[in-house]
Amino acid sequence: MRDLLQYILLLCFVTQLSACNYKSKQADVIFHNAVVFTCDGLHDNTPKSLAIAVKDGRIVDIGAEYAIRNTYRSDELVDLKQAVVYPGFIDAHAHFLGYALTLSKVNLVGTKSYDEVLSRLETFALSNPDGWLTGRGWDQNDWQTSTYPTLTELDQLFPVRPVAIRRIDGHALLANSAALKIAGLDNVRYFSGGEMLSLEDGTPSGILIDAAAEYLLKVIPEPDDADKRRAMIIAEKNLFECGLTSVVDAGLNVADIRLIDSMHKSGDLSIRIVAMASGTYPNLDSTFNIGPWRTDRLIAESIKFYMDGSLGSRGAALVEPYSDRLEHTSFLFLDSTDYCNALLRANEDGFQVATHCIGDAANHSVLNYYHQVLGGVNDRRWRIEHAQVVNPDDLWMFGRASIIPSVQPTHATSDMYWAGERLGKSRIRHAYRYGDLMNTIGILPLGTDMPVEDIDPLKTFYAATIRKDVTGYPESGYMMDQALDRSSALLGMTIWSAIANNNDREVGSIEVGKWADLVVLDRNLLTAKPEDILATRILRTVVAGKTTFNASNGQH
């Protein structure tokens, strides 16, 4: 009898104790009834039916539905109805401000001929009659002729109004005579680090490449801060609809970085941005004087250099001549002494360095320069952006000095139609080697390079794994021996990008203590049929626990 009484008393005590603990903790929001992929280990993508408790923007607990809901109370319970939850997508290489500004210019993406380019310009000019006429997105490789356009037709349509339209990669542009005159480029001239093409009679063709293009762009009036603010607010909404919660802006001036910071502080901008400062003078000096810094939403600890141009405009620096232009290899943009001095200063001041390298000559040079500064294995996380054509003999250098290759998979599926002509049958096997690049260091951050490519990370995932364009071409995939498995592609869009951004302690996986940056999808990318990947719907995007996009009501 005494034992029974003791048992009853103990049971009452335990019950009372449990009642005291029931919903004893406060959360701001609880996301529940979800299939969660935490991405919290390099090879741990096992789905779990979990609930996530969030307070002050950070994840405070993750666990079984009953455990979280019995422990935490919250005024906001979000039932995700067994939808799939990943860490918020991270774009490891983009041009966010550049993309934003293209939204108010002539969109030339997808044009199938020069005539279509001219037609879009005429249409846009009717409703935008004043000032410079600018646009971006044409690609002569998508046209039947595959040759550069000239200013002849532009001059006929716009004899007085200045026109400058950039190629999709941003490394070349076409200008009419009015624009060339304003820039003082009436006659063909030599550019170090660039090229100005001519017609048969020796007069300018209107095509300016790399440094020559930059020279003309400097005379086009810059949008003011108010225009940039409006553009970025619109652009951010588009990114949230795609499930992006963080984006790298690869090459900004100090003033624009400060503008982004002010927008974060005012609440006009929510998306996390890794702002790589442009490594050109005088911006480089200003960046060194300020030093590396960060806030909860903005990281300004990286410097971006350009070592060469693009493959499409034949500006990528190759060791051997282009297969379709036998006298041409292009050139390295940067003086070796100046570049090495900048690397030494960046290393001393604690900056991350990222360098644009497309051609095998550029990749070889920068890998060697990095080695000279870094020495061996380290945690500086210096990056090579694009790593598009890499000699097999150079691959070992990535791992030896912990150099991170940062790639954009849709480049492979956009370039595959003509890249073989540029590089030849043998050398094309050295290009778009995503599998080999991943194996050099164990991670491979993925990005879009927007506005060069589409902003949609689902297209990044599809191109990385299926290696086809959006029409399903080629049927067997492009160079499938270099395709990523789906788990690696997901990690490349989440935790691996966070590692490359020096922000993996804060974002990139769903873990206690990290920011609650999430994306909710209607299907699992790891198991979806290949033909269904691009049909995936983003249902919700969450930044620091707050829903920034909700497909059910169009909420931003």
Walk through the language-model features, giving the residues of each:
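Bacterial Sec-dependent N-terminal signal peptides
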Residues: M1-K25
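Non-cysteine beta-strand/loop elements that form the S-adenosyl-L-methionine
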Residues: H95, R297-G315, S402-T413
